[in-house]
Amino acid sequence: MPAHVISSEQQRDRMLHTPIPRLILSLCLPTLATQLISVFYNTADTYFVSKLSTSAAAAVGVVFSLMSIIQAFGFGIGMGCGSIISCSLGGKDNDRADRIGSSAFVFAAAVGLALCAAGLCTLRPLMRLLGSTDTILPYAESYARIILLAAPVMCASFVLSNVLRAEGEATLSMYGMCVGGLLNVGLDPLFIFVFEMGIAGAALATALSQLVSFLILGWQFLHGRSIVRLRLQAVSRSPRDYGQILLIGFPTICRQGFASLSSALLNNAAAAYSDAAVAAVTISNKVYLLVRSMIIGIGQGFQPVAGYNFGAGSKPRTRQAFWFSTLFGTVVCVAGAALIALFPEQIMHFFRDDPEVTRIGRQALLYACAVMPVMAYSTYVNQLYQCLGFHQAATLLASCRNGLLYVPLILLLPGLLGLSGVAMSQPAADFLTFLVSIPFQIWFFRHKLRG
């Protein structure tokens, strides 16, 4: 017990007194790796499955909508408990941190089990709803069935990872994700081509990799390498605790939930043209997501710093954390956009050697590059509100990119501009979200971070 207290005090001192640039870099570099590895799960699947057929490649995009639903609840519960934990540790309330972490873990596993049962019972209509055509449907069903079975483990892993990040142990969080990601890349070609399992092999590789990540993350807690202790006795029986977790995590649930909705709408809009169009937007979205995942990774380093320092009353360090993260994220976005804009055809060809897929995907990538430089700012304004407990504004901002702004655009632009309208809907929503975020950031700094 004394070692635990000393560890907690040392961590609190680090979060409150280490220079902000050095602190955020130390936290965000592991989370960057974690985010990239997380995207790598799907990107590796897309790459190897694309070698089977264009319809199989499109199926990955359809099931991505389903995975976004699972991630919505896993990330939402994880972010909710993570924000409470970082503020609790900043205020020296370790018992509350233990209670929230333990409760969130059990809650996430239960939600994942419910999603698994509901998804398996409605699999075929669900796949059609998410954008499957008759030719895509068999591939989508094979892939989704195995992913659904892994849902409880996936949701619980997101909580374990967020608890470690919330206490400032981003490196420990990274270990599990990195090992799982590397395993996924190795298992994909083995199961798909050597064992001739096809697209089901890609799903099995992802599920097993998620299980390995879960076991590695759980080992950190079982062997006392974390500040927060997960114990069955600490699981809360108070609805108020679960309500708080959901309230703080609700912006993330909205953001990821709308991501699922937007992906389904995009798939359906593209399916009106061809399977090649669905495959093209699937691949271009994976590339776009690689850059966005880096922005989110930096933000996951920023959030515990903001939570600790705001909880301890250090407003100047909270402001500095926001601006440093925004600058760093913008530089990453500009570099990513420049690289993609230079080689759009080569990137598309790397995934699928289909001239029609390359033509459509190239256009989508160039539209995305045009708005990448403004993504970091709007993302961190949203995360600032969320991690400091301003739930209503955070939910509104989280709903803009993939919901309030995107849904009207994806319903309107394809009718006006055809396939080009499908490709430009998400970039247009990203730019409008940036404009909406500006007054929110100005207000917050004037009224909550002054002094």
Model-flagged regions — what are they?
Residues M1-T31, I85-P152, V194-F250, A306-V371, ...:
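Short alpha-helical transmembrane segments in multi-pass integral membrane proteins
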Residues I69-A72, N184-P189, F214-G218, L290-S293, ...:
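Hydrophobic transmembrane alpha-helices of multi-pass small-molecule transporters
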Residues S26-D45, I146, G180, S209-S213, ...:
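Transmembrane helical elements of multi-pass membrane transporters/channels
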Residues G78, I147-R165, S173-G181, A202-L217, ...:
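Short runs within selected transmembrane alpha-helices of multi-pass transporters and secretion channels
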Residues L36, F40-A58, M127-D134, L190-M197, ...:
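Helix-terminus/linker motif at the lipid-water interface of multi-pass membrane proteins
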